[in-house]
Amino acid sequence: MAVDPVQERSASSVQSLLRALDLLEALGRLGDSRLGELADEVGLHPSTAHRLLGTLCARGFVTQDGRSGRYRLGYAVLALAQDTGKHTGELRVIARPHLDAIRDACGETVNLVVLERGRAVCIEQAEGTRRVRMNMELGRGFSAHSVASGKAFLAYAKEWRAVLGRDEPYDRLTPRTKVTGEELEAEFAAIRASGVSVEQEENEVGVTCVAAPVFSTSMTPVAAISVCAPTTRLLEMQSGLTRLLRGHAVELSRQLGHSLLTSPEDNGARTLKSDFDRASESSRGAGS
């Protein structure tokens, strides 16, 4: 069978793009580097690395010292990073009142999470008022397949396997972690149907999390709002909490320009109050 020249050129272009991205990531890890060091780091022939670096230099993503010949990241990368930081900063500011309102209703720590390279990363947090509370470390990444916030992203991804960047079975972090595509596909369908993601002790034994996706102008989530708590405590207030998260996620999405979501009739605040009061009474003796 003859090879389609258009498809062949397309495959070659994708390969070149991936190699160029590998070089950028290598420069980010290594800092100023010689051609040979970079080629070895990413497994390329020096001539191929030199050609790709030349293109990146021409676009300002990489610069080369004229005397030493060493390469470093260019100002175009910094400009992109500043744009990303600006977007993230705006998102945090707009989301903050919602995080505070949810925290005030349930007493638990509330997280604003984004997806970075297949990992759920907390970028903002309203710390809970409970003596025993579950906090996501700011800036730390968690495997998206094992946490509620990560699943809230994956459920809407066209190619969620590519987002994870790994082959199944995925890492089993606890006995309850879902590690096969079949298990995750079923869960993602349920998340899309309900608008919320519930993860029970899949990332850490004894901890359960609930999350709701936040959208901007498309059906691809730009963030997720999540609450994590000791399993017994969270399950006792799950009904009201999921509805409360969903209501705030819908409102935040509208503020970010989304218009396709509908808000539930009851945002969950009343249900959550009775659930939370019951959970507080049952856990008071345990010193929670």
Predicted feature locations:
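Amphipathic alpha-helical regulatory segments at dimerization interfaces
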Residues: 26, 41, 93-105, 194, ...
